[in-house]
UniProtKB/Swiss-Prot annotation:
It holds the Pfam family ADC. InterPro entries: Acetoacetate_decarboxylase, Acetoacetate_decarboxylase_bac, ADC_dom_sf. The gene is adc2. The keyword S-adenosyl-L-methionine does not apply. This is Acetoacetate decarboxylase 2. NCBIfam families: PRK02265.1 (NF002614). The active site is at K118. Belongs to the ADC family. Keywords: Decarboxylase, Lyase, Schiff base. Its EC number is 4.1.1.4.
Length: 263
């Protein structure tokens, strides 16, 4: 194979049989169970990278179980993980802290293209009589269980769609061949072409179990704030580099107590 042929075909590995195809990545009948809970603000500060900012007065985590039965190039799979509400340069969004799923294609593609923090796990999302149930197993151990009353009340579709349209942020890290970081970037991406099919709220509960390699319980559940069940079709948009950690220092806005020192 000639060098020019390698360059033309270079998209993903292995070169002759990539783990995932080029996009667009369209998802049909995507289903979410999102349980928002209050946690320890010090724990959040320890895991959210600057220049993203937290609201210390409202330290929240969104625990998500997502069923994806029909996705272009990725197939049929389920995902589970934690998203932390943040702001970046005055715009609110979500920081993807950890994700576990059961499909090689989106694990490889998610990490390589966007920088999703994906690891192999065994999540499920299903309806059992009157209850929506999400679980996450890592190996033989259960590390997360979420439950919600099935379609108790309709949610405000305008608010739900606006939340889905907010930017999301990822910390993309790709090492060099010597182990040093070759790419270390804050990546922003959005969900696009959203067709919201329904959204509901109801009572919910969430249990997280400590695990050395699936440390979702490191952000402990102090109080359940809300729960949301969503069905939608959407496209996963490609990302843009919002901040390059190898090229520029983080620019943190001055706090009120600091402004007086520079005026």
């Amino acid at each position: 194979m000639r060098e020019n042929d390698v360059r033309k075909r270079a998209f993903a590995m292995p070169l002759t049989s990539p783990a995932y195809p080029p996009g667009p990545y369209r998802f049909v009948d995507r289903e979410y169970l999102i349980i928002t809970y209050r946690t320890d603000p010090a724990r959040l500060r320890a895991v959210v990278p600057e220049p993203l900012e937290l609201d210390d007065r409202n330290p929240l985590v969104k625990y998500e179980f997502i069923r994806m039965p029909d996705s272009n190039g990725f197939g049929d799979y389920t995902e589970s993980g934690q998203v932390i509400p943040v702001s970046f340069r005055g715009h609110t969004g979500g920081y993807n802290h950890c994700m576990f799923l059961n499909d090689e294609g989106p694990i490889a593609g998610g990490r390589e293209l966007w920088g999703f923090p994906k690891k192999l796990g065994q999540p499920t999302l299903r309806t059992e009589i009157d209850t929506l149930i999400g679980t996450l197993d890592y190996g033989p151990l259960r590390v997360a269980t979420g439950t919600m009353g099935y379609k108790h009340r309709e949610a405000d579709l305008g608010q739900v769609k606006a939340a889905l349209e907010e930017p999301n942020f990822l910390l993309k890290i790709i090492p060099h061949v010597d182990g040093s970081p070759r790419i270390c970037e804050l990546v922003e991406y959005r969900l696009e072409q959203i067709a919201l099919k329904g959204a509901w709220t109801g009572p919910a509960a969430l249990s997280l179990t400590p695990h050395a390699l699936a440390p979702v319980a490191d952000l402990p559940v102090l109080e359940i704030v809300s729960a949301l069940h969503i069905r939608a079709d959407l496209t996963l948009g490609l990302g843009r580099v919002a901040h390059d950690y190898l090229q520029e220092p983080a620019r943190r806005p001055f706090r009120a107590s600091e402004r007086s020192l520079v005026t």
